[in-house]
Amino acid sequence: DDFRETNPPTNPELLDHLASVLTSHQFDIKQLMREILNSHTFQLSSKPTDSNKTDDQSYSHYLVRRLPAEVMLDAICQVTGVAEEYAGHPRGTRAIELWDNQLPSYFLDTFGRSLRESPCECGSSGDPTMAQALHLLNAPEIELKIQAINSNITQLTNSTLTNEQLIDEISFRTLGRPP
């Protein structure tokens, strides 16, 4: 991420451990991911307990936060199976791959696109807004993705799955877990 001397790691021991895992397994990314994903810290619940409900710095529980604008738009494209189109970029380009933060996108503007002026996200707010909620409910672009003939949603609703199976499948595709 940002390895400048002016931005020291918050947990240098952890960074050293992960570097050791990476080098000892010949830079096997899957092994590194296994190490991280199987860790106690990664698997912590987002539900705070009485003893850690005010803790927002010690990683005592997962802190729920809104996805960045680019990740949210890419997730909507992934779930619906309908790619976003950006002028001057091939179809299927993901929002996270855009280097030009001036490309017109009402979605990215509404959800607080990264200005890409600094590796720090300290200038952007993760708090949801009414405009964001209304955009998710009423945006014609999202409606077109959902209703597209080739969308995953259309294929699922035209399938022989029961309502319960549809809910399960959509939950797995969007959340990666059962409802």
Q: Can you say where each PLM-predicted feature lies in the sequence?
A:
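Alpha-helical secondary-structure segments
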Residues: 28-38
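An acidic, gly/pro-interrupted, aromatic-rich
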Residues: 1-8, 16, 23, 30, ...
